[in-house]
From Swiss-Prot:
Gene encoding the protein: glyS
InterPro entries assigned: DALR_anticod-bd, Gly-tRNA-synth_bsu, Gly-tRNA-synth_heterodimer
Top-rank EC class of the record's enzyme: ligase
Subcellular location: Cytoplasm
Organism: Rhizobium etli (strain CIAT 652)
Reactions catalysed according to its record: tRNA(Gly) + glycine + ATP = glycyl-tRNA(Gly) + AMP + diphosphate
Domain of life per record: Bacteria
Annotated EC: 6.1.1.14
GO cellular component: cytosol
Protein name: Glycine--tRNA ligase beta subunit
Keyword set includes 4Fe-4S: no
Keywords in alphabetical order: Aminoacyl-tRNA synthetase, ATP-binding, Cytoplasm, Ligase, Nucleotide-binding, Protein biosynthesis
GO molecular function list: arginine-tRNA ligase activity; ATP binding; glycine-tRNA ligase activity
Self-association state and partner proteins as the record states: Tetramer of two alpha and two beta subunits.
Length: 704
């Protein structure tokens, strides 16, 4: 079957946009072809810095013929109805329509509309200009003389050429010649900008990809990534080092080169006195280079790895030299602000009031930065006040939480007042992603307690489902205070997540609270802390997501989660115990009996059947109902005692003793006895089953 090759070649596409753009191209083109009546066996997208390409194989040569019967009005309908039918069906007179008789509805017109299939070339030429013109780039531009005209083509960077060929796998292909803003599709492309700028004639994908590789363009982005990664590992190993791998940087760099050449540069060892995180970010952010470390060690080396798009005649010496100069200049700047952050601020006399407010020591650099943060009234959020006010709230909340977590109150207070201090450091000003981490380093340098220093960094954690959870009690306390302050604040001003929008990462903050409470076994009454039922419901949603990711069943979570359940650790423990119980043989059988009891009881309640207020032992006539009543009385007490002692497994074990009596009751006892008093008493007995199991879970919500 025929194949379609499409290439859109332009000036350099930003690396961050390439993968999505190629995926968008594939979806837009294949959707349009399928909508036009074509089918295909497979499609794959490709991208380089200067091109998006699409290979569609097994594409049908033409769309199928279509025959449609369109039912019209009765033959005796008014003239306007018939004229409307003819216009809609594309008929000039009723003589072109068929008349169909229906015994009940009479005679009516039917238009038979036949649409012959269309050649694939015609369909592609028709749909492609619209796809290109309406392409969903995040940012796009106009260029050239046509840019001043209304409706001028917009593309991420100036579009230079289009390749569009179609034909069988082993025969000559044809060019599908469509045109957009003066650019006509052809079978001509170009290779590497510097190494092979000559025109290349292509027929189909196989020779297209091979021709590009000869012209020093590796079309497959995953291959480019693989080449970069393995060459970088090899060159590092050859120098007694190992690559510090970075998947995000690898993805970006592979989108900057068409012919990757991996080289190694170096900088003076004096710069290794800068924290490794700053070195890594400086080299990554400014030069898109990888750092290395000594084999088997954590400390960085003074060698870095760069990826060039040019295979230089001198082996890359000039490229390495040029990159080295820039890296040294950037590291010199980094060393400067690293040292400045450890020094005194020039205006200490203006910070006395802020220092007094937070109990700060203006002889210490990090304390000075916190005082400066407060004195400048740096805004946290227009409706939530300044960073200083935020720190004061976190400090007060952390004091309350310390009594629950068991954290040292004095250390917790000290950590709270220093937690946001590094926001005024030059290091964090340059690299905001280092907030917390730099605060910890500066805290250590000025002699802070290890728990305080750890809390300054870790109070931001966890920042996602895979991030680690703080372990130190001071860090746990501060992390909870920070996240709870954020959540209660944004709930108070009605800035809640909506749909896919969550600009303040409130879902992440709530999940962080859930993970800390559960993974560090913290008992925290959230309603007493947040005083917001809607926010508690939000925590419940995050808890469900977390527990489901841990393998818990949704129905079991719903069975134990009540609207006012604000001790999430207890909810999780109930789910754990219920899961173990409900998967046992006793649990499965008790569930079946309990559901039968609750369903029967619910049906009678709905009908308004009289149910006794309590079970009367005198009205228990059969041994099975007497046995069940005794079992419920015993199991209910044991289960309630176990729940009171927060021993949910023992509560489940107590309830498991009901299995036999419940089974026997339904085998031997007719609930709807003719005697109304006995019936009401037996229904009351069923209610006791529901109440007994309800001490640990709502069994009616459990599937199965």
């Amino acid at each position: 079957m025929p194949n379609l090759l499409l290439e859109l070649r332009s000036e350099e596409i930003p690396a961050r946009m390439q993968r999505k753009a190629a995926g968008d191209l594939k979806k837009l083109v294949t959707d349009a072809l399928v909508e036009a009546g074509l089918s295909y066996e497979g499609a794959r997208e490709y991208w380089t810095p200067r091109r998006l390409a699409l290979d569609i194989h097994g594409l049908t040569a033409r769309s199928a013929d279509v025959r449609e019967e369109r039912k019209g009005p009765r033959t005796d309908a008014n003239e306007k109805a018939i004229e409307g039918f003819l216009r809609g069906a594309g008929l000039s007179s009723v003589s072109e329509a068929q008349v169909v008789s229906d015994p009940k509805k009479g005679d009516f017109y039917v238009a038979v509309i036949s649409k012959p299939g269309r050649a694939t070339e015609e369909i592609v030429a028709e749909v492609m200009p619209g796809i290109i013109r309406d392409f969903p780039w995040p940012k796009s531009m106009r260029w050239g003389k046509a840019s001043s005209k209304s409706g001028a083509l917009r593309w991420v960077r100036p579009l230079q050429s289009i390749v569009c060929t179609f034909g069988p796998e082993h025969e000559e292909t044809t060019v599908i010649p469509f045109e957009i803003d003066g650019i006509t599709a052809s079978n001509i492309t170009y290779g590497h900008r510097f190494h092979a700028p000559e025109a290349i004639t292509v027929r189909r994908f196989d020779d297209y990809a091979a021709s590009l590789e000869k012209a020093k363009v590796i079309l497959d982005a995953e291959r480019r990534k693989d080449i970069i990664l393995h060459d970088a590992r090899d060159i590092a190993f050859a120098n007694g080092l190992e690559l510090v791998e970075d998947e995000g940087l690898l993805e970006e760099v592979s989108g900057l080169v068409e012919w990757p050449q991996v080289l190694m540069g170096s900088f003076e060892e004096d710069y290794l006195s800068i924290p490794s995180e700053i070195i890594r970010l400086t080299i990554k952010t400014n030069q898109k280079c990888f750092v290395t470390r000594k084999q088997g060690e954590d400390t960085l080396s003074n060698r870095f790895i760069l990826v060039s798009n040019i295979q230089a005649h001198d082996g890359g010496k000039e490229i390495v030299h040029g990159n080295g100069k820039v890296v040294r200049a950037r590291l010199s700047d980094a060393l400067h602000f690293w040292k400045r952050d450890q020094g005194n601020l020039p205006d200490l006399e203006t910070l006395a009031a802020s220092a007094a407010k937070f109990g700060l020591d203006l002889q210490k650099p990090l304390d000075q930065r916190m005082a400066k943060l407060d004195a400048l009234d740096v805004t946290f959020h227009a409706k939530l006040g300044t960073q200083g006010a935020r720190v004061a709230r976190i400090r007060a909340l952390a004091k309350e939480l310390a009594a629950i977590t068991g954290a040292d109150p004095a250390l917790t207070d000290r950590a709270a007042v220093l937690a946001k201090a590094d926001l005024r450091t030059e290091a964090v000003g340059e690299f905001p992603e280092l907030q917390g981490l730099m605060g910890r380093k500066y805290a250590v340098l000025q002699g802070e307690n290890a728990s305080v220093a750890a809390a300054v960094e870790d109070h931001y954690k966890p920042q996602g489902p895979s991030d680690r959870v703080p372990e130190d009690k001071v860090a746990i306390t501060l992390a909870l205070a920070d996240k709870l302050d954020t959540l209660t604040g944004f709930w108070a001003i009605d800035e809640k997540p909506t749909g896919s929008k969550d600009p303040f990462a409130l879902r992440r903050a709530a999940l962080g609270v859930v993970r800390i409470l559960l993974e560090r076994r913290v008992r925290l009454p959230l309603l007493a802390t947040t005083r917001d039922g809607d926010l508690l419901s939000f925590f419940h949603d995050r808890l469900k997501v977390y527990l489901r990711d841990q393998g818990a069943r949704y129905d079991l979570i719903d069975a134990v989660l009540t609207p006012d359940a604000d001790d999430l650790l207890m909810v999780a423990r109930r789910v754990e115990a219920l899961t173990a119980f409900i998967t046992s043989e006793d649990g499965k059988n008790l569930l079946a009996g309990t559901k039968r009891a609750t369903q029967l009881l619910a049906a009678e309640e709905k009908k308004g059947t009289v149910i006794a207020d309590g079970v009367s032992p005198a009205l228990l006539k059969l041994d099975a109902e007497k046995e069940l009543f005794a079992a419920i009385s015993s199991a209910s007490k044991d289960a309630a005692d176990a729940v009171a002692g927060e021993d949910f497994r023992s509560a489940m074990e107590a309830l498991s003793k009901l299995r036999g009596p419940v089974d026997r009751f339904f085998e031997e006892v007719l609930v709807n006895d003719e005697d109304a008093a006995i019936r009401a008493n037996r229904l009351a007995l069923l209610r006791l089953i529901r109440e007994a199991t309800g001490t640990v879970a709502d069994f009616s919500k459990i599937s199965g």
